[in-house]
């Protein structure tokens, strides 16, 4: 990495903090296991004057999706994960999923003949959804299951998702969802 470019990045972040367009930041750049930049600047909590720290925790919401996707593709490159693998190969709970269809206002559940693959999770075609992606009976089940609360572990969260009905058969429809949470 070029030290001049790293200094420019640092100066740009400091300028954004000085202009109060950014309360604070933690910047980390690493390559091949070597950290070349790691700095904290600005405030973690402007109201309290709490300085940003290297260990500050951020709520990044859907920005985890590209991070998880890159990590998954690194595992694919290493031969430790195959995109065509069924999710059930790694998580048994995904072996017996059901897809929901609404008939005359009633939710009917049907077994899924072929489960979702890793590829389906990454491209949001696994049949999962969000509770706010509509107001139908499937979305209500997601809300009732409190999947947004994230009270449990990742394993518990995945188990909960596996037990909820799918909005579509895996591989058939794009539905922005909690798929990369799995």
What are these regions (language model features)?
Residues 1-31:
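Beta-lactamase-like hydrolase cores
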Residues 35-41:
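Amphipathic coiled-coil signal-relay and dimerization helices
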Residues 179-182:
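Hydrophobic mid-domain F-helix/FG-region of cytochrome P450s
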Residues 14, 46-176:
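Active-site-proximal loop and beta-strand segments within enzyme catalytic domains
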Residues 34-35, 80:
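Residue-level signal for well-ordered, solvent-exposed loop/turn and beta-edge residues enriched
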């Amino acid at each position: 990495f070029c030290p001049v470019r790293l200094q420019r990045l640092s100066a740009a972040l400091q300028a954004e903090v000085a202009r109060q367009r950014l309360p604070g930041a933690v910047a980390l750049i690493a390559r091949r296991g070597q950290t070349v930049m790691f700095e904290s600047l600005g405030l973690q909590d402007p109201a309290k004057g709490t300085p940003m720290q290297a260990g500050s925790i951020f709520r990044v919401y859907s920005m985890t999706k590209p991070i998880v996707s890159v990590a998954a593709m690194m595992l694919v490159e290493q031969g430790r994960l195959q995109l065509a693998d069924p999710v059930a190969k790694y998580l048994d709970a995904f072996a017996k999923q059901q897809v929901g269809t609404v008939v005359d206002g009633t939710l009917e559940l049907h077994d899924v003949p072929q489960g979702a693959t890793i590829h389906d999770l990454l491209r949001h075609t696994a049949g999962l959804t969000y509770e706010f992606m509509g107001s139908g009976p499937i979305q209500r089940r997601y809300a009732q299951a409190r999947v947004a609360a994230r009270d449990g572990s990742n394993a518990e969260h995945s188990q909960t998702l596996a037990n909820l009905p799918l909005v579509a058969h895996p591989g058939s429809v794009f539905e922005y969802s909690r798929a990369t949470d799995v």
